[in-house]
């Protein structure tokens, strides 16, 4: 029996969203355009999630740039960035319903798709092929978190910056030096020395 086009899109997304698949396949979910998924256009420096709020959605960047960060005193510490086709959400709040300890804000004018947690759960029930969809989305988030830990804990300053440049191509040209430094866990002075050294090597 032939499946509906909408069902096929979800199945395709389910099969593509594996540990080794590139994040661009997450866009397949957006293409389904089911109830509960809506595109939003927001200005630069728009707060999508505030500290203390419960994150009950998953966002996926269509165009633009989003920062996930937490406050340490008066300083903003970057936890992650979401660029085109990347998901963003607070995993602890999304899974456990806890008030968020992070904030989510746009760093550019951004278009993103937002899917409500309950709607996502309903979709998983509606399309039995998607029983593992929820877990796969979380898996992507956990892998990203693990990569962040490895970046901070096991690499020296130069390796951290090089890894960021290689793994997130173009990101460092879109965010400030302050955000780069806080993300890889170095001071701005150290970052300046690294960039100067790399510039000397290139030229």
Describe the role of every protein-language-model region.
Residues 48-53:
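Short phosphate-coordinating micro-motif centered on Lys-Gly-acidic
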Residues 135-168:
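Strongly charged, low-complexity linkers/loops
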Residues 155-203:
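Phosphate-/nucleic-acid-contacting segments
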Residues 43, 62-63, 83, 108:
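A cytosolic small-molecule/anion-sensing beta-strand core signal
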Residues 77-135:
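Cyclic-nucleotide recognition modules
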Residues 56-67, 85:
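Glycine- and acidic-residue-biased ligand/ion/polar-headgroup-sensing regions
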Residues 1-38:
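Cyclic nucleotide-binding regulatory module and flanking cytosolic helices
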Residues 47, 65-70, 87, 111-112:
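Short beta-strand segments in beta-sandwich/barrel cores
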